[in-house]
């Protein structure tokens, strides 16, 4: 691979990221005093993971996605828990966000074709 200076490099340079920034661990609130209450408040069956976090408040806010993956937490739950933990850290209210539901006719891209097929089937009945 040729660089702009005309030198040939066999391996591209890897840019090192700076050291991880330390994230603050917020104090528990009156409505959410422990890990179990937090996971129950955010819903989506996250309360089943109380043992995974060893019921330690620090683990909930210090563990990253890699750590949760090694503990066997699914991708969707990892992302959801980390998002809700960040909201709590920022002082925003924590509440359950329901999962979205797909339309009967599918996604937006194929909707016209799907609706046309459905209407044709209804006419033929």
Swiss-Prot record:
GO CC annotation, single: ribonucleoprotein complex
Pfam families from the UniProt entry: SAM_Ribosomal_mS41 (PF09597)
Subcellular locations according to the entry: Mitochondrion
Location of the transit peptide in the chain: 1-10
SMART domains per the UniProt record, alphabetical: IGR
Residue ranges of the region described as Disordered: 103-125
Protein family (similarity comment): Belongs to the mitochondrion-specific ribosomal protein mS41 family.
PANTHER family: PROTEIN FYV4, MITOCHONDRIAL, SMALL RIBOSOMAL SUBUNIT PROTEIN MS41
Function: Involved in telomere length regulation.
Protein name, as recorded: Small ribosomal subunit protein mS41
Protein species of origin: Candida glabrata (strain ATCC 2001 / BCRC 20586 / JCM 3761 / NBRC 0622 / NRRL Y-65 / CBS 138) (Yeast)
């Amino acid at each position: 691979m040729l660089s702009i200076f005309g030198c040939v490099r066999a391996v591209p340079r890897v840019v090192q990221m700076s050291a991880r920034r330390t994230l603050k661990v917020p104090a528990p609130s009156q409505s959410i005093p422990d890990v179990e209450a937090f996971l129950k408040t955010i819903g989506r069956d996250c309360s089943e993971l109380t043992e995974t976090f060893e019921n330690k408040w620090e683990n909930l806010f210090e563990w990253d996605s890699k750590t949760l993956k090694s503990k066997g937490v699914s991708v969707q739950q990892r992302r959801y828990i980390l998002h809700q933990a960040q909201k709590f850290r920022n002082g925003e209210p924590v509440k359950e966000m329901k999962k979205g539901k797909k339309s009967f006719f599918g996604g937006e891209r194929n909707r016209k074709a799907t609706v046309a097929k459905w209407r044709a089937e209804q006419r033929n009945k």
